[in-house]
Structures are given as C-alpha cells and as structure tokens.
C-alpha cells in the first residue's frame, strides 16, 4: 500500500513538474535600449526570462549595426517568457508603461532613433485589446502628456548578438549602465506595486 502511494506521489510530482515547466507564455515589448528593458523585466516575479533582440522590421536576421542605422525598421525589443499563473499579460503591460516614458517619440533618455521607439507587439486579439484598454486608461487619467506607443502585430523576433544578453548583469560598472540603466531601474522599483525578485 505504502509503495503504491509512493509511486502515485512520484508520478504526480513529475506530472506537475513538467506541467509547470511547459506552462509559459511569451510577450514582446520595445521601450528603448534593450539592455535596460531586459534587466527590468527580469526583476518581475513570474518572469522566467527576458531576451534582447530585434522585431518590427523588414530585414531578415539583422545585425546590431544594421538596426542602429535605422534602415531595417526594427526596434530594440525583448522577448519575455513568463508564467501566466504568477503574472498576467496585463500586469506585464503595466510594468512596460511603469518602466519607461512613452511620451517621447522614437527616444528614451539619451537614445534617439526609430529603433528606440515604444511598442507592444501583440500575438493575438486578447493581447491587443488588453494593451489598448490599458492605454485608454492611461489617457483618461492623463498619466503621460502623450502616448506614442505603437500597438502592432508581432511578426518575428531575432535574438540580439550574444554580448547584448544580460548586458547589465555582466557590465555593472559600464558608464551607460550606471548613468542610464540603473536610474531607470530604480525609478521602476519605486513606482511599481508588482512583486519583484530581490
């Protein structure tokens, strides 16, 4: 009897483990330099990972230099893998707006260019409506003087070069990280009510 119970427990545990392992969704956002955006989203409880990359353009597998030229149409963006049981898409949208200034067209802080635009790349009608609904609320509350955020259909995401991944963690003393990324992260921490990892 005990052996049967033990086998059932092990079976259930493995089933639960694999169910949890597979129960993730993805979301795509652009809000300026992806070094900053990636680091901020990785703070949020329920986010499994964030990856820097490029989306919203026409060139296949663009390089960083090509994207920076402004000719490919891509935005510096992140791919967020998250557990919907822990954090909803709506909350990620909230974090997106809490972590940058959507009122500046094609600019975040010192970074200027279409690759630094504010954008939400939706994958289905539900995501689209949730993003638009939240923007409507922000406009009604006059949270920002303007909202330039694009809400556009997701097409394809190209991961950025290896050295861009987890850039803030790998280069904490970098001048840009100290002068731009860290202050932006601190402002987000102060503003958000979402649970964050230590």
Regions found by a protein language model. Give the residues of each.
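Flexible coil/turn and secondary-structure edge motifs
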Residues: 20-198
């Amino acid at each position: 009897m005990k052996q049967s119970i033990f086998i059932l427990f092990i079976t259930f545990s493995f089933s639960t483990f694999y169910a949890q392992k597979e129960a993730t969704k993805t979301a795509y956002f652009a809000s300026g330099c992806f070094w900053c955006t990636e680091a901020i989203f990785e703070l949020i409880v329920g986010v499994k990972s964030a990856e820097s990359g490029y989306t919203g353009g026409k060139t296949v597998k663009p390089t960083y230099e090509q994207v920076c030229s402004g000719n490919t149409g891509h935005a510096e963006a992140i791919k967020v893998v998250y557990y919907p049981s822990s954090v909803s898409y709506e909350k990620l949208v909230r974090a997106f707006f809490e972590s940058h200034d959507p009122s500046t067209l094609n600019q975040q802080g010192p970074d200027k260019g279409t690759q630094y635009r504010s954008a939400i790349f939706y994958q289905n009608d539900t995501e689209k409506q949730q993003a638009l609904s939240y923007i409507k609320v922000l406009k009604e509350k006059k949270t920002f003087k303007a909202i330039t955020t694009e809400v556009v259909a997701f097409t394809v995401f190209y991961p950025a070069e290896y050295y861009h991944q987890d850039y803030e963690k790998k280069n904490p003393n970098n001048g840009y990280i100290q002068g731009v990324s860290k202050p932006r992260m601190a402002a987000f921490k102060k503003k958000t009510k979402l649970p964050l990892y230590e």
